């Protein structure tokens, strides 16, 4: 496992950082020495997160915006360069959930979910990659889902967005490996976040379930990003002990 100085010379950009997995991932990287750029739409939450990181002796800055807006992606990468002179790791975590049958899903809802989960991943990666190529290396992780590995009834559009992330990452691995850039996906099962609500699940039932804590997923993300230079993790599935493997 990474120690307190593993990422001391690294600058990390985390999208969807105002809660859940993104929040815990930013805290975890900062706790291991990384300089962190965080982004999401809720500015008050980002400010709270950065204040917490700084209070613990870390370095963090934020940019509030919609991850599906290209200007947000551009500004976040530029902020990393301005404040930390580099960008080493991109965690594409921004996203949304949807638990609806196909016949209850509108075209507008399809577009919104695809924008949140896939377009945001494309935009941030598109703006981060030139920086990483210039640096002769970097790492990009997509926080997908077990819903990207198999289809679940009542989640067709959500599954489609997560399958898209995995395919995108697999293609990029082939494109970017020659530049020293590692690309992979993390596929969590059930996690105690706001996106777990639905299909009869309430906030209380989620909190009392055996679902993964966001912090546990963050630990898997840091593990994937702390591999030796000559090895990479292409895909990692993380499930809680009460969840079947398939």
Set out the residue ranges of the language-model regions:
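C-terminal helical subdomain
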Residues: 181, 185-186, 193, 205-246
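The beta1-alpha1 cofactor-binding region of Rossmann-like NAD(H)/NADP(H)-dependent oxidoreductases
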Residues: 43-44, 64-76, 107
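Active-site helix of classical SDR
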Residues: 125, 161
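Conserved glycine-rich cofactor-binding loop
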Residues: 18-19
């Amino acid at each position: 496992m990474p120690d307190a100085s593993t990422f001391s010379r690294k600058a990390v950009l985390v999208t969807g950082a105002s809660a859940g997995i993104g929040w815990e991932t930013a805290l975890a990287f900062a706790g291991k020495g990384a300089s962190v750029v965080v982004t999401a739409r809720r500015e008050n939450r980002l400010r709270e997160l950065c204040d917490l990181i700084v209070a613990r002796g870390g370095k963090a800055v934020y940019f509030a915006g919609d991850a599906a807006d290209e200007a947000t992606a551009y500004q976040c990468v530029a902020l990393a360069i301005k404040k930390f002179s580099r960008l080493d790791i991109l965690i594409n975590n921004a996203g949304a959930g949807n638990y609806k049958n196909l016949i209850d899903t509108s075209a507008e809802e399809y577009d919104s979910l695809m924008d949140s989960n896939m377009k945001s991943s494309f935009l941030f990666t598109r703006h981060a990659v030139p920086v990483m190529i210039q640096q002769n290396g970097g790492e990009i992780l997509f926080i997908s889902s077990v819903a990207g590995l198999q289809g679940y009834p009542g989640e067709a559009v959500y599954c489609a967005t997560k399958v898209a992330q995995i395919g995108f990452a697999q293609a990029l691995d082939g494109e970017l490996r020659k530049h020293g850039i590692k690309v992979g996906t993390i596929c969590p099962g059930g996690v105690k976040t706001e996106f777990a609500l639905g299909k009869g699940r309430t906030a209380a039932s989620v909190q009392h379930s055996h679902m993964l804590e966001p912090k546990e997923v963050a630990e898997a993300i840091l593990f994937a990003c702390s591999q030796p230079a000559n090895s990479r993790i292409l895909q990692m599935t993380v499930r809680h002990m009460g969840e079947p493997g398939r």
